[in-house]
Amino acid sequence: MRGALALVLLGLSMAGCSGPIETRVSSAGEEQPIAGSFMLAPLPDNSADELTGAQALLVEGLLTKGYHHADDADMMLTVGISDRPAQLTVKNGAQILAPGKQPKMWQSCADREYRMTIELTRRADGAQLYSGNASEYHCNATLTETLPSLAKRLVADIERPRGPKLLVRLGKD
């Protein structure tokens, strides 16, 4: 009896740290496969390690999909990341760009929103072939821990941009 009670209490205490993670993906671009060669937009000299890591994760994912990384390529890949308190609403004038998130019941820490953005442009004419962002709310996970999931979602979406969608995975909140 005590053992069962201990397991229930342990499960309840861990419920705030892990569970379903919602990944919000929004994208636009060409609807046909655009695999080819790509080069990376240069990062600022003082770039955070997380940005360099995000870029490396995206390169790895694109290589597995048949893209080719080159110093002089047909396409330019630009990568960005952000980290903000999730309860803040981001606006441009009256337009809400990112609504604030309300805490969940029994939540013991404040959420942060981690976001990765990518843009793939054709170098010859500057045409945008793909633009996408993936974001997640986390209470305990760090930006670094979240980057692999965000990169995976964007790489999976790059050849089939479909506007906004919501995907769910299990992981560290």
Locations of regions flagged by a protein language model:
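C-terminal/domain-edge helix-coil "capping" segments
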Residues: 18-30, 113-115, 122-131, 135-173
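Acidic helix-start/capping segments at beta-turn-to-alpha-helix junctions
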Residues: 70-87, 171-173
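A structural "domain/chain start" motif
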Residues: 15-60, 64-65, 164-173
